[in-house]
Amino acid sequence: MIYKVLYQKDKIQNPRRETTQTLYLEAPSAVEARALVEKNTPYNIEFIQELSGNFLEYEEKSANFKLTTF
């Protein structure tokens, strides 16, 4: 599955919508996606969304869509 991960760059500052960033990740489950991001980055994860069907098609059309690999 492909997951959209919304995050803040660090865990020190309070989350603000204006500074939320996104990465896309392929993982077997949302739990494993979270574990991968937590293991490989200092990011503060806000939300993980599974993408499929029309949602995935829409995101793939975005210029920012790029699968992250660790």
UniProtKB/Swiss-Prot annotation:
Keywords attached to this entry: DNA-directed RNA polymerase, Nucleotidyltransferase, Transcription, Transferase
EC code: 2.7.7.6
One GO BP: DNA-templated transcription
Gene Ontology molecular function, alphabetical: DNA binding; DNA-directed RNA polymerase activity
Source domain of life: Bacteria
Disulfide bonds: none
Entry annotated with the keyword Transport: no
Enzyme superclass (EC): transferase
Record-level GO cellular component terms: DNA-directed RNA polymerase complex
Assembly behavior: RNAP is composed of a core of 2 alpha, a beta and a beta' subunit. The core is associated with a delta subunit, and at least one of epsilon or omega. When a sigma factor is associated with the core the holoenzyme is formed, which can initiate transcription.
Protein name per the record: DNA-directed RNA polymerase subunit epsilon
Lineage: Bacteria, Bacillati, Bacillota, Bacilli, Lactobacillales
Gene: rpoY
